Structures are given as structure tokens and as C-alpha cells.
């Protein structure tokens, strides 16, 4: 389940130059992020880990602002939103995706994974850079 609209403003992932020890680092593997921290089902624990290690992380806080059960999706959870974009955007009241979205998947102390939901492109952004947040929750 994802929020019907983006968080009000673009925000930084946060905690730049600081590795989050509670969140696995996910590197490139033939151009694809794989492993613990990137998978479907990892977003909730990633978000909790981010906030444990850095309680001021704007993207994770933005996702949690919807409620305790909401979280920043992992990169593969975000990719599922891309794969189901047409279905999601057909829901009454759903605001169309725009530009890049943060995932809860960390790359290293300086970067985190993001996805351009219109095209499906995945890549990295500096943690101090700003992107959109679309919160999700498990069901």
C-alpha cells in the first residue's frame, strides 16, 4: 500500500557522510541493487534502522509522518511501484508520480538509492540531495 500523494516537499535522505550501521549497504551488481536492504520487505526495517542511527533523517521522518506503520520503501519496493504505476495512477485520488523518489536502501556513507518512477531508472544520489518521498506500509 502506498500513500495517495507525495510528501509535501522534496527532502534530503539525510545523515550525509555517515554510514547507518543498522542498514546494510547495497552496491551495484551488474547494474542492479541486490541483497539485504534492497529487497521487498526490507523497507520497514531499513526505515527503523535509519531513524535509530540518525533520528533527524528527513526522508525517513517524512515517511513516518504518515503514522508509525508507514515507511520509506526499499529500492525493490519502489521498483514495484514503478511496475504497477498505471494501476496505481488509475486509483481515484491518486496523485501521479513525478521525478525521483528516495528509497530506504543505503549505498554507502555518502549516497543512497533512488528511482525515477516514470522511466524505472535506478541510481544514486548524495544523501544531502533532495528527492520526493512516497510513503508505503505493509498489509
Protein language model regions, located:
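Short aromatic-cysteine micro-motif
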Residues: 2-71, 75-76, 80-82
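C-terminal, surface-exposed recognition/capping segments
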Residues: 5, 56-60, 65-69, 75-139
